[in-house]
């Protein structure tokens, strides 16, 4: 019996779209949205809207977009958002946002790898804290973040509306570089 070859995985910063990147990114986002993990979207927007979103987010100077690939195909993404320039008091903290892996690509460690690459990029950019928030219904994401050392510091009881009902959302932070928390 021949063993199936192990798929190749990679995570990289996406600075421009080449080849089938835009198509793959839209397909992966669509699959994640349909699977309930659409980083804010609850229903799939028209394709031209999604394409404009991805083209546009790459142009935002305060954002870095990262892509996860399975066998060379984009299957997920995350963004590192810098604080606005007028918020000097919180210049130490960046935001991990818009994080997803398409359901068909889960189980290969890409979600973890994606978060770790974003953490490294945040640290390299001089940030000492990474913040994120997540809907209470995203159990796998919560398990991932808590397993990577993110600390839940609060819950908003009416964070989002899904299927006509309000659901809670949780706020997390992580000190980068292993710094101790202030006492």
Predicted regions and their residues:
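C-terminal "cap" of GNAT-fold acetyltransferases
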Residues: 3-7, 94, 128-131, 135-142, ...
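Acetyl-CoA-dependent GNAT
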Residues: 12-104, 115-117, 121, 175-178
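Structured loop/turn residues at beta-strand edges in well-structured enzyme cores
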Residues: 73, 125, 165
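Active-site acidic-Proline motif in GNAT/NAT acetyltransferases
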Residues: 102-104, 108, 136-137
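Short polybasic/polar patches that bind polyanions
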Residues: 106, 123, 146
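Conserved GNAT acetyl-CoA-binding A-motif
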Residues: 115, 122-133
């Amino acid at each position: 019996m021949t063993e199936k070859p192990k798929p190749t995985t990679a995570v990289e910063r996406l600075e421009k779209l080449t080849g089938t990147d835009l198509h793959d990114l839209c397909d992966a986002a669509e699959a994640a949205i349909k699977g309930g993990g659409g980083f804010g979207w609850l229903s799939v927007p028209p394709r031209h809207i999604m394409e404009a979103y991805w083209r546009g987010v790459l142009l935002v100077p305060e954002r870095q977009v990262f892509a996860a690939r399975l066998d060379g195909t984009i299957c997920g993404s995350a963004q590192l958002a810098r604080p606005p320039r007028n918020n000097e008091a919180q210049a130490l903290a960046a935001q991990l946002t818009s994080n997803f892996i398409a359901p068909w690509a889960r189980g290969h460690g890409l979600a973890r790898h994606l978060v770790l690459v974003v953490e490294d990029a945040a640290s390299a950019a001089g940030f000492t804290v990474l913040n994120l928030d997540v809907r209470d219904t995203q159990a796998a994401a919560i398990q991932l973040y808590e397993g990577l050392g993110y600390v839940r510091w609060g819950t908003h009881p009416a964070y989002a509306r899904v299927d006509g009902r309000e659901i809670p959302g949780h706020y997390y932070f992580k000190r980068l570089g292993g710094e101790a928390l202030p006492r």
